[in-house]
């Protein structure tokens, strides 16, 4: 049976936003367990980053939202027999055990009585303050039982692992990736430009259509916008900026024979706005060498900048061919060479060429950190300033991230049996990189947000 997320009961989504095995763990801890202490951290992963970026406020909002929704749904189970039965049926179906399903629902009702008396979960949560350069294996979120904890509810400490990781790792990983892109752009700006202010707009978020869900797209856009000002994910942040831009459906509307008219019409229609036009719907080199020169006066009369966007081809040669360039051989020219030839450029204080201020390049086809670095290095070798190009960073970068990029994990680090705490450390002999940190953490950078 096919089921979309919107068809699932909202309360069940809040109650069961976890891996199935979490429901059984309340039965598995030692009988004398009176408390647990768990920690979310990034242990280092496959991204090759020396450190990572962490945002306290985002993690706090996620945790408080998850806890709030969970508590509301727990109370709803007690007040709605139909919902209680639906919960029992769902758990029974998953585990094939009616008694297990019934007992889980009864346990949720026990928690509801606790919430009515204490008005919050018996948990204390601390979150590390924000940082742009944290060391891996730093405790980021700690959760333990509060003074109100009772043995029957100890399982709650680890119950939220799945939903917290699911909602935290992508945003924080995107922050780290966006920071690395910003630092790369600033490096080339410092080498070739008169200032670095333009780098705030030099990576534009193109990722929404390639993300796995609207929620993922919003997390990525919001994180991207902590370092850049541009995103085409309109809902992704309160300060997202974009410009008017065409796509192939617009550029092909008049057919190839009417391509000159298409460019002319759009330039005349938007003379006072920043405008981005796709140039490779047919023959990009014809556009650069014939159509745009015919419209030169229209381009130069504009009040704002015209951005030209190639959307296909070999990234190694498309924008600039580096030292292969031969002014007498147009097969060695890239996009920037045609624009320089037909519209001119100036030389900045560092001796690098800056295209006519009415023109720029946008390139967003399969963009990665490595491709950006390659293109900027080629431009530098040819004597062009890095400000001549804006990159569209899409799902090739942001959808290729996963939890292992930075190694986000949530692990039990201490257990209290009776009145005594014991450190807990996972240390698999088959993979030393998965060794967990152990103990409880008295870190002044951990700020209490719940309990």
Curated annotation (Swiss-Prot):
Stored Gene3D superfamilies: Aldolase class I (3.20.20.70)
The highest taxon in the source lineage is Bacteria
What is catalyzed by this enzyme? beta-nicotinamide D-ribonucleotide + diphosphate = 5-phospho-alpha-D-ribose 1-diphosphate + nicotinamide + H(+)
As recorded in UniProt, coiled-coil segments are: none
The residues listed in the UniProt record as binding diphosphate, with positions renumbered to this chain, are 209, 248, 309
Q: Which InterPro entries match?
A: Aldolase_TIM (IPR013785), N/Namide_PRibTrfase (IPR041525), Nicotinamide_PRibTrfase (IPR016471), Nicotinate_pribotase-like_C (IPR036068)
Molecular function terms from GO: nicotinamide phosphoribosyltransferase activity
Q: What is its EC number?
A: 2.4.2.12
**Hey, which pathway is this one from?**
Cofactor biosynthesis; NAD(+) biosynthesis; nicotinamide D-ribonucleotide from 5-phospho-alpha-D-ribose 1-diphosphate and nicotinamide: step 1/1
Q: Does the keyword Transferase apply?
A: yes
Q: What class of enzyme is it?
A: transferase
Name the UniProt key words of this record, in alphabetical order: Glycosyltransferase, Pyridine nucleotide biosynthesis, Transferase
What this protein is reported to do is described as:
Catalyzes the condensation of nicotinamide with 5-phosphoribosyl-1-pyrophosphate to yield nicotinamide mononucleotide, an intermediate in the biosynthesis of NAD.
Q: Which family does it belong to?
A: Belongs to the NAPRTase family.
Q: What is this protein called?
A: Nicotinamide phosphoribosyltransferase
Q: Which organism is it from?
A: Mycoplasma pneumoniae (strain ATCC 29342 / M129 / Subtype 1) (Mycoplasmoides pneumoniae)
Q: What is the lineage of its organism?
A: Bacteria, Bacillati, Mycoplasmatota, Mycoplasmoidales, Mycoplasmoidaceae
